[in-house]
Amino acid sequence: MTTDSAKDSRTMDFLLVTGLSGAGLSTAAKVLEDLGWYVADNLPPELISRMVGLSLTSDPPVDRLAVVIDVRSRLFTGDLGWVLTELEAEPIHTRVLYLEASDDVLIRRFEQVRRSHPLQNDGIDGTLSEGIAAERRQLAVVKAAADLVIDTSALKAHQLRQKIETAFGNDANRTMKVTVQSFGFKYGLPMDADLVCDVRFLPNPHWIPELRPHTGQDADVRDYVLSREGAEDYLDTYRHLVDLTIAGYRREGKRYMTIAVGCTGGKHRSVAMSEALARRLGSEDDISVSIVHRDLGRE
């Protein structure tokens, strides 16, 4: 493996992901994609070096490449040594992630999805237990060469995600991405909303002639809405609810949230309140906020 001191001169992170069938390789691949890695699944060992070369010369170049290989790729001991030796000549920082689980857990997982082990399909071993045992033998040296071994026997999907994020993510990957979306109830609820708040309890600027042509993005409407009784208290209280929800999302490995803020037409109150809420959320370093005014301009 490449040492940490050598990493500084290397231009791409390369992660070889392998392990036992049923140990969570597919989940790991999805997590790495969410973390911004370019993921190639089940790539034959003889094509790995070519994939690395193409990634280094692509425009723009790939900063982080992960290749997921399981027993179907026939990654035997000799293949692994040859691949890693060849990669040492490339300007990359190489790491190996190995996923495993206990026999009883693997058997239960295969039985739950009613699938046979890959080695059973090839006729190498007749029973599920024998297929798992054969795979362990084939990948023993791969495991010994790994930089990180994760036993997924007792892990739920979000717990595996957290471990992978800790090992292979960065600060940007751990940022919660929040979209605050204003809307008008008369046009229907946003289908992608995780949270919905109703600000129709506030007086409607629509009924004030000098404010009616303006929107919640204009200072006069914004000041009017936010100065109404209960507006600031509502924002403070709702911010606390959002904080609790974000904490729960993080525990579950979720990194995206959409908050829908609705009024009657999506022009005045919801626009002003959604922007005020977004300002409150945007003050946190680990939250990235974007604003969408879905129905602004429809009237």
Curated annotation (Swiss-Prot):
Binding site for GTP: D70, V71, R72, S73
Segments traversing the membrane: none
Pfam families: PapZ_C, RapZ-like_N
Gene Ontology molecular-function annotations: ATP binding; GTP binding
Domain of life: Bacteria
Ranges in a coiled coil: none
Keywords tagged on the record: ATP-binding, GTP-binding, Nucleotide-binding
Keyword Translocase: no
Binding site for ATP: G19, L20, S21, G22, A23, G24, L25, S26
InterPro entries listed in its UniProt record: P-loop_NTPase, RapZ-like, RapZ-like_N, RapZ_C
NCBIfam families: PRK05416.1
Protein family (similarity comment): Belongs to the RapZ-like family.
Main function: Displays ATPase and GTPase activities.
Protein name (database record): Nucleotide-binding protein RER_30260
